[in-house]
Amino acid sequence: MASQGTKRSYEQMETGGERQDATEIRASVGRMIGGIGRFYIQMCTELKLSDYEGRLIQNSITIERMVLSAFDERRNKYLEEHPSAGKDPKKTGGPIYRRVDGKWMRELILYDKEEIRRVWRQANNGEDATAGLTHIMIWHSNLNDATYQRTRALVRTGMDPRMCSLMQGSTLPRRSGAAGAAVKGVGTIAMELIRMIKRGINDRNFWRGENGRRTRIAYERMCNILKGKFQTAAQRAMMDQVRESRNPGNAEIEDLIFLARSALILRGSVAHKSCLPACVYGLAVASGHDFEREGYSLVGIDPFKLLQNSQVFSLIRPNENPAHKSQLVWMACHSAAFEDLRVSGFIRGKKVVPRGKLSTRGVQIASNENVEAMDSSTLELRSRYWAIRTRSGGNTNQQKASAGQISVQPTFSVQRNLPFERATVMAAFIGNNEGRTSDMRTEIIRMMESAKPEDLSFQGRGVFELSDEKATNPIVPSFDMNNEGSYFFGDNAEEYDN
């Protein structure tokens, strides 16, 4: 990364901070985490949740969604201007699950958004603490990435469903800022751009007038974000072309799909952060942990240590496997939906199975499901080792990947080969190679074809014992490369529907 000097670290993006040294960054991230924890404790008090109920991940998600909704200014404004029957724009709520006479009961609660904003600000030293809100959004996004497939969304924009490893962060709201942009995959941003271009094709006023000027600025900004994720000059040059186009249309859509595909081999830099449910931070604060004083990092050992001694519960449907539910949440906590299963399994110290083999649906429970028939069980979120989260895509060598997902996006900085199915990826590049980007396309295809095993594996650090907090003795795991490495293999998960 040549431009390292101009890049702010995630943690700075995360906390909106200026240049800070490592200790200051750890302190400001700690302040953000502590604020989420204090908010959660206060909400549990207001809702009169027992200790057990406060540790229920479904309750945590409801409380998290309420605070996100309370601060969603654009939507709040929209709701006030377009009143719909039965929706009070000033209130927010959701299902809270309580244990009554040995059974779980669902209670729908409603709360003033103003009241929730007050509790949140009070927990965050009177500030709006947008960094904390973004952090919660990223946790929800990571949970969606591990739970749902985006096949329909990919197909709609003309991409191939097997490119799912590029779709990290595809459900993040627009308002998630720089920290949100850092964790979005190449496919996610390409898809947002394609949607914009399609609107421009169908609506001639899209790029015109005062609004159109703002749209254009957003378009160019998004192009620059995507350009910044690519690591090769040819990919970046092609992004310049897309950005500078006077009147973006089908040629640009083609270019974006081409670039997204190329990222399966010439991977982009996508940040990974471990964002945990609010109840985990609440438990730690309640037990006297001072995050700001101790400092905290989203990409180091801290989240692993936190999960080692947190007990979180989840409702389990009658035919679900609690171990599988735990795996789903573990992957979400570490942003590992697109990581090689062998790496995740080694770090976790348990076999990690592909999603098609999981006997579990999502964590959230629909309003028409019968809660009384459900039990709760402890989520096993501990790990055997820890590893630093990566922000680079690494590079790849030739290796078998699978039918459902033809590449991985590394989460952990662990040295290994990265699987991808060269024949499948390259087959997509036959055909259209003329026009203004032809020389760049040729160059990109040449780089992909010459992707050699030895120079293109992912150079990581290795994993560490949990007692090795300073990351001094890396253990480089060896993986059985004949095994299946991707999570989305033979997939049968539900689609993500807003």
From Swiss-Prot:
SUPFAM superfamilies registered for this protein in UniProt: flu NP-like
Residue ranges, annotated region (Disordered): 1-22
UniProt PTM comment: Late in virus-infected cells, may be cleaved from a 56-kDa protein to a 53-kDa protein by a cellular caspase. This cleavage might be a marker for the onset of apoptosis in infected cells or have a specific function in virus host interaction.
Gene Ontology cellular-component terms listed: helical viral capsid; host cell; host cell nucleus; ribonucleoprotein complex; viral nucleocapsid
Keyword Glycoprotein set for record: no
Subcellular location: Virion; Host nucleus
Sorted UniProt keywords: Capsid protein, Helical capsid protein, Host nucleus, Host-virus interaction, Ribonucleoprotein, RNA-binding, Viral nucleoprotein, Viral penetration into host nucleus, Virion, Virus entry into host cell
Transmembrane stretches, start-end: none
GO annotation (BP), single: symbiont entry into host cell
Intervals of motif Unconventional nuclear localization signal: 1-18
Biased composition regions of type Basic and acidic residues, renumbered to the chain: 8-22
Single Gene Ontology MF annotation: RNA binding
Main location: virion
A Pfam family annotated for this UniProt entry: Flu_NP
UniProt motif Bipartite nuclear localization signal: location: 198-216
Domain of life: Viruses
Family: Belongs to the influenza viruses nucleoprotein family.
Function comment: Encapsidates the negative strand viral RNA, protecting it from nucleases. The encapsidated genomic RNA is termed the ribonucleoprotein (RNP) and serves as template for transcription and replication. The RNP needs to be localized in the host nucleus to start an infectious cycle, but is too large to diffuse through the nuclear pore complex. NP comprises at least 2 nuclear localization signals that are responsible for the active RNP import into the nucleus through cellular importin alpha/beta pathway.
Subunit structure: Homomultimerizes to form the nucleocapsid. May bind host exportin-1/XPO1. Binds to viral genomic RNA. Protein-RNA contacts are mediated by a combination of electrostatic interactions between positively charged residues and the phosphate backbone and planar interactions between aromatic side chains and bases.
Protein name: Nucleoprotein
Gene field: NP
